[in-house]
Design a protein with these regions (language model features):
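Short basic helix-loop element that most often maps to the first helix and adjoining turn
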Residues: 19-38
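Recognition helix of helix-turn-helix/homeodomain-like DNA-binding domains
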Residues: 40-56
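DNA major-groove recognition helix of helix-turn-helix/homeodomain DNA-binding modules
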Residues: 59-74, 80
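Short, charged recognition helix plus adjacent turn
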Residues: 78-117
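A short glycine-rich, His/Asp/Glu-containing loop-to-beta-strand
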Residues: 107-149, 206
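A short hydrophobic beta-strand segment most commonly corresponding to one strand
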Residues: 134-139, 185, 190, 199-215
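Short, conserved beta-strand element in jelly-roll/cupin
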Residues: 136-140, 153-169
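Short acidic-glycine-tyrosine-enriched beta hairpin
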Residues: 172-187
Length: 217
């Protein structure tokens, strides 16, 4: 698998994110303006995200999936049953279809999404895992989960392990610096922000448990 193969695969996933966001919003039955109001962003940003003209930040993406009651898997991978007309698949169709899937995920097969502010997420599971987000996260030089002083919070608990680079983690008023081999765990309902503190890209393994039970905060 070449770097070009991985890039092309990611681009094909990226191209469908806006359509899936729009489908999820339509399914809930709210306007772009109303979603923007709930998230505290401009309606034009929602329009740009749905049209593929802008990338969401980590905070905005978490806010959107929470408000629309969808999982990250549904937005990144595309789930025809959830992102289509909302109708459940007939039982007889499920019984007739056989889709064996390996639990192994190779680097070139990861579902990935590029976010604003130099952040990239690659899913490390082959199938949708419900209330579990298991990702390989990359923070480019200067990359951050949210802009300065704009912390996010959501339901769940986070676990992280740094592979490369220096990752800054702010939790409330506390600041932590993680170097390769360091790990961290914290309650996601606490305001937090992740950012690259060094001069090389950060690579980390991140695990969020229970975010799907969220109610908007």
């Amino acid at each position: 698998v070449t770097r070009s193969d991985v890039s092309n695969h990611t681009r094909s996933i990226q191209d469908g994110v806006g359509d899936r966001l729009r489908a999820a919003r339509d399914r809930v039955g709210i306007s772009q303006r109303e979603l923007a109001r709930r998230l505290g962003v401009s309606p034009s940003l929602i329009s740009q995200l749905e049209n593929g003209q802008s990338l969401p930040s980590v905070g905005t993406l978490y806010g959107i999936v929470t408000e629309l009651d969808v999982s990250l898997d549904e937005i990144i991978r595309g789930d025809e049953r959830r992102a289509g007309d909302g109708a459940p698949e007939p039982a007889e169709s499920r019984e007739l279809r056989v889709e064996p899937r390996s639990p192994l995920v190779h680097p070139g097969e990861r579902q990935a999404i590029d976010l604003a502010s130099g952040v990239r997420w690659e899913e490390l599971t082959a199938d949708t895992e419900g209330d579990v987000d298991f990702i390989h996260a990359t923070y480019e030089i200067g990359g951050a989960s949210t802009p300065d002083e704009a912390l996010i919070r959501h339901h769940g608990r986070e676990y992280g392990y740094v592979i490369k680079g220096t990752l800054g983690v702010q939790i409330g008023f506390q600041y932590y610096e993680l170097n390769p081999g360091d790990s961290i765990a914290f309650d996601s309902t606490l305001p937090h922000r992740l950012f690259n503190k060094g001069d090389v890209p950060v690579e980390a393994i991140w695990f969020v448990l229970g975010r799907g039970a969220d109610s908007r905060r």
